[in-house]
Amino acid sequence: MAKKGKKYQEAASKVDRTQHYSVEEAIKLAKETSIANFDASVEVAFRLGIDTRKNDQQIRGAVVLPNGTGKSQSVLVFAKGDKIAEAEAAGADYVGEAEYVQKIQQGWFDFDVVVATPDMMGEVGKLGRVLGPKGLMPNPKTGTVTMDVKKAVEEIKAGKVEYRAEKAGIVHASIGKVSFTDEQLIENFNTLQDVLAKAKPSSAKGTYFKSVAVTTTMGPGVKIDTASFK
């Protein structure tokens, strides 16, 4: 542990904690200070000026990042009839009806995202207490409750990420891997930031983008200057 701590301290010493960097500088620095011995994820955290206790200031949705996330997402689709073949053709890893409800109730979780057609939500609803806490419950706001299972699966496989403001108004999301080029990460970041800007509740007052930071898995955080943000 001491060795890991030393590596982190050396990496952290390259980051000026009092400075707010441009998006380009922050992403470059985050990559340079990655200490993981694997292709680490690049994560961002937006602290928004919202009150999540108010229903009209809940922020949740999904966006397809132009360069994907670098992660392979396993997709489970609850569907029936011709929607089963449609989901399979789109690349879904698992497709079915009640049999998967039973498997999940028995502790099976070999998937990352759940999609369901509206007519299956009666069955999927039985899993609310299991899927909800894990953030896996299908939701119309994120496009995971839909009859267009083809589009839903293809977007997830292409690099769609879900975002949701937590209690403190913080949105966490992955925008790629350290192996991505700076340009790919910047483009992904800008896409996510633009979506969050457009999602600003009309009732939110004061500064919206309160603070933003980028980091890699196990690496130090790098603050981003939000002055130019909309």
From Swiss-Prot:
The keyword NADP does not apply. GO terms for cellular component: large ribosomal subunit. Pfam families: Ribosomal_L1 (PF00687). Keywords: Repressor, Ribonucleoprotein, Ribosomal protein, RNA-binding, rRNA-binding, Translation regulation, tRNA-binding. GO terms for molecular function: rRNA binding; structural constituent of ribosome; tRNA binding. InterPro entries: Ribosom_uL1_bac-type, Ribosomal_uL1, Ribosomal_uL1-like, Ribosomal_uL1/biogenesis, Ribosomal_uL1_3-a/b-sand, Ribosomal_uL1_CS. CDD domains: Ribosomal_L1. GO terms for biological process: regulation of translation; translation. Part of the 50S ribosomal subunit. Binds directly to 23S rRNA. The L1 stalk is quite mobile in the ribosome, and is involved in E site tRNA release. Protein L1 is also a translational repressor protein, it controls the translation of the L11 operon by binding to its mRNA. NCBIfam families: rplA_bact. This is Large ribosomal subunit protein uL1. It comes from Staphylococcus aureus (strain NCTC 8325 / PS 47). The lineage of its organism: Bacteria, Bacillati, Bacillota, Bacilli, Bacillales. The gene is rplA.
